[in-house]
Regions:
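Ankyrin repeat domain, specifically the short helix-to-loop turn at the C-terminus of the second helix
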Residues: 3-23, 49-71, 97-119, 147-166
Length: 168
């Protein structure tokens, strides 16, 4: 409901891009975004709706590609991306939701391959990728879901899954 309010005409008159970014990037006391909590606790519908709202808000407030990338990465104060935490927990449903939605953002905002791969690799502050942490925790089904989602979006974005693997 709150994110819906940001897209109303009156909000657009009262709010500027900086205020909207501050609202979207609000963090808990632990330095976590709302998207992080949804990914960590395996709430795919929340992830899909939040990212959908970001998509609409980004357009209305003319957010930069860098702003959008920061919101999609959703990193904690320690630099842990949202996809990394979902993979480390074995939350395959949100992994699928997140990657499927990235496809929409990548097309709409013309992400470079490097930008997309940065989000998909989801490396932590120690440079460990989301795939590696999932394997480390024996979340093989989540890794399988990850690569299946990658294969789907790779066809529409013209890259091969092997290209991404070399980036991991």
């Amino acid at each position: 409901i709150f994110l819906n309010a940001l897209t109303t005409p009156i909000a657009q008159e009262l709010l500027n891009k900086k205020i909207v970014m501050d609202i979207l990037a609000m963090k808990t006391r632990d330095g976590e975004l709302g998207l992080f909590a949804a990914m960590e606790n395996n709430h795919p519908l929340c992830v899909t709706r939040f990212l959908s709202k970001i998509n609409g808000i980004a357009f209305k407030y003319k957010l930069s590609k860098a702003n959008i990338m920061d919101l999609l990465k959703g990193a904690t104060a320690h630099g842990t991306p949202v996809l990394y935490i979902a993979m480390s927990k074995g939350n395959e449903d949100v992994v699928l939701s997140y990657i499927s939605t990235l496809n929409i953002f990548a097309k709409k905002y013309s992400f470079s391959q490097r930008q997309l791969f940065t989000l998909l690799a989801a490396k932590n502050h120690d440079n460990m990728s989301a795939v590696h942490i999932a394997i480390h925790h024996n979340h093989y089904k989540t890794v399988k879901t990850y690569y299946a989602a990658i294969n789907v979006i790779s066809q529409s974005l013209s890259f091969s899954a092997d290209e991404l693997k070399t980036y991991l």
